[in-house]
Amino acid sequence: MGDIFLCKKVESPKKNLRESKQREEDDEDPDLIYVGVEHVHRDAEVLFVGMISNSKPVVSNILNRVTPGSNSRRKKGHFRQYPAHVSQPANHVTSMAKAIMPVSLSEGRSTDSPVTMKSSSEPGYKMSSPQVVSPSSSDSLPPGTQCLVGAMVSGGGRNESSPDSKRLSTSDINSRDSKRVKLRDGIPGVPSLAVVPSDMSSTISTNTPSQGICNSSNHVQNGVTFPWPDANGKAHFNLTDPERASESALAMTDISSLASQNKTFDPKKENPIVLLSDFYYGQHKGDGQPEQKTHTTFKCLSCVKVLKNIKFMNHMKHHLEFEKQRNDSWEDHTTCQHCHRQFPTPFQLQCHIDSVHIAMGPSAVCKICELSFETDQVLLQHMKDHHKPGEMPYVCQVCHYRSSVFADVETHFRTCHENTKNLLCLFCLKLFKTAIPYMNHCWRHSRRRVLQCSKCRLQFLTLKEEIEHKTKDHQTFKKPEQLQGLPSETKVIIQTSVQPGSSGMASVIVSNTDPQSSPVKTKKKTAMNTRDSRLPCSKDSS
């Protein structure tokens, strides 16, 4: 009885040992033998988690015994049923893979960033059967095979897109999450893998070998089919990294905006705006040497008064005005007492005096010829047609002082050449040194018909003097400072005043240099006019 009880005690440990062995054999049945990380292409830094078909049998740690039949059972199992999913040798890439983000990568990315899995599209790689796993085919696969994942993360950024890539939507992947098996707990030494959440935008794509030519006519994305662009159309870019995608998108936007700016931008500079007074009017100080004060006196033949040069000029002016009032002719009522210009009617004369000589406010008046105009635009057109930039027709014959305004020359002579031996004619700015010729010259200006210059207020007794005056004095004497350094073909905008925000201000565009008259034509015209001007002189002399 004691021997039997001892045998039972000895047999019970053996039975427990068999049960533990059987339990270990059952634990070794899962099809997944080894999940490894294989560097398929080191240049692109591709990480591949694949399934190795030529796996070795598991060595049992108990009694150093190899589990019998494990290798043959696996070869005869699922791998023969699904030959299309057997992984290729090391120089090939598995044709079927599902994209699953590692835990370390998924934690660093945002939930809305796309996850893309793609195989190498270089010519050196071949794929036995490239295909897209549909929901129907994935359901027929065993759970162990469905969990095999090839996760490839492109570090170099090459081959980021291929026109013939095929994609599955997120719903197709998430519908099979319940059938997947976690590999993290069962396999030591393998990085833990996590299934992509349903709210994460993920993309699965398998690329066929291509060399930049689009073979497929469309692609599927989020369940909607989009046609691929033609070979002549724009290239389709599918960036794997969302950060690089955003940076490249910003770069493309900046380049396009610069291009648009370059198209709309005018390379030519705008025409410079110059004031009318700066463009047409000016002064020249002349020699700048003061004349010697001689205190010469002059005697009037009418009233026998002896006066110095400036007072004698004023005295002669009063004699001329008194002579006009005494005659009481029509011409006296139509001639301006300031500029000695004659007008058709007394009303026009009075309007001229009010607008030009005694005007209180700014008006459209040409300072060179002392004529008033209705608007500033008419004044600008007059300046463009009749005057040149920097024109100074009024000249002091003593010191060569010049100005565009007659009043400046008269004031200059009265202040700078006072108490000298010179007398100035206020009709033509001619100089005299004695009283009798000066008085006769002034009487001729008032009694006979004079030649009015068409470009200024001066009046001449002979045509020769008028032509000489127009030829010498009505030219550009000094170029305006605003035009210095500008090319000759530059267009300049002339305005009466420059005010900010005045878009409707009167203006006119003038060339930097106006065409000058030919010297040959000027000489011919001068000679002809000189010959004609001699005829009236001969009649008067006779």
Curated annotation (Swiss-Prot):
* Protein origin, superkingdom: Eukaryota
Subcellular localization is given as:
Nucleus
Ranges annotated as biased composition (Polar residues): 107-122, 499-520
**Gene3D superfamilies cross-referenced by the UniProt entry:** Classic Zinc Finger
**SUPFAM superfamilies for the chain:** beta-beta-alpha zinc fingers (SSF57667)
List all membrane-crossing ranges: none
Predominant localisation class? nucleus
What's the protein called, per UniProt? Answer: Zinc finger protein 280A
Q: What is the scientific name of the source organism?
A: Homo sapiens
